[in-house]
Design a protein with these regions (language model features):
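Serine-esterase "nucleophile elbow" of acetyl-processing enzymes
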Residues: 1-52, 63-71
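Alpha-helical cap/lid subdomain in secreted, periplasmic
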Residues: 30-42, 58-206
Length: 206
């Protein structure tokens, strides 16, 4: 079973770009380890093609070489936060909410048309950190768009925003999962990986 992880720096997580089987230090590492342990008889191939800094338009541009060409059985997609982040970066790339929806829809339509993969979407999130407070209103507008696309295209959806909100009620330390509100530390990566692995299990066991 071939599983492709696709996304931005949260997925990339320091992986070796010369070796797409390298999971890096992020959630793909944890998800792949959990699945390998849970299904020891399954012949998994895990491929991490996340690229740090990517927006939805950039993911679409590399979708064939970095996703479709692998002929995945399952693909997970975590993308969208950089479309907001880059509105404030030095380059100030102004991607509108409508453009994000158009880009993301194009990604999903192409995956549906050109692969037989089960599609798992993950919601972008912002954790409790002053560094990202200026982005919260924009993420609040983006999340319903992503949920609507998930209803239309995805086989499964991981609501990371809600899952983190609930987890932080039990672990209120803001820096427990991330130092900057976006990029997970080991605790955050394990949290995402565990929830994604549980979602994959639901697909594998069908």
């Amino acid at each position: 079973m071939r599983i492709v992880f696709q996304g931005d720096s949260i997925t990339d997580a320091g992986r070796d770009k010369r070796n797409y089987h390298d999971m890096g230090n992020g959630y793909p590492k944890y998800a792949s380890e959990i699945l390998t342990e849970r299904f020891p008889e399954t012949d998994f191939e895990f491929i991490n093609m996340g690229i740090g800094g990517n927006r939805t338009d950039q993911l679409f541009d590399r979708l064939y070489t970095d996703a479709i060409a692998f002929e995945p059985d399952v693909i997970s997609v975590l993308i969208g936060i950089n479309d907001i982040w880059h509105r404030y970066s030095s380059g100030r790339i102004e991607t509108t909410d409508e453009q994000i929806e158009t880009n993301y829809r194009a990604i999903l339509k192409r995956l549906r048309a050109q692969t037989n993969a089960k599609i798992v979407m993950l919601a972008p999130y912002l954790l409790d950190c002053e560094k990202v407070d200026h982005m919260r209103e924009e993420l609040a507008r983006l999340l319903p768009i992503i949920r609507r696309l998930a209803d239309e295209f995805a086989d499964a959806f991981v609501p990371l925003d809600l899952l983190f909100d609930e987890a932080l009620k039990q672990q209120p330390e803001p820096l427990y999962y991330s130092g900057d509100g976006v990029h997970p530390n080991a605790n955050g990566a394990e949290f995402i990986g565990r929830h994604l692995a549980e979602t994959f299990m639901g697909i594998i066991e069908k």
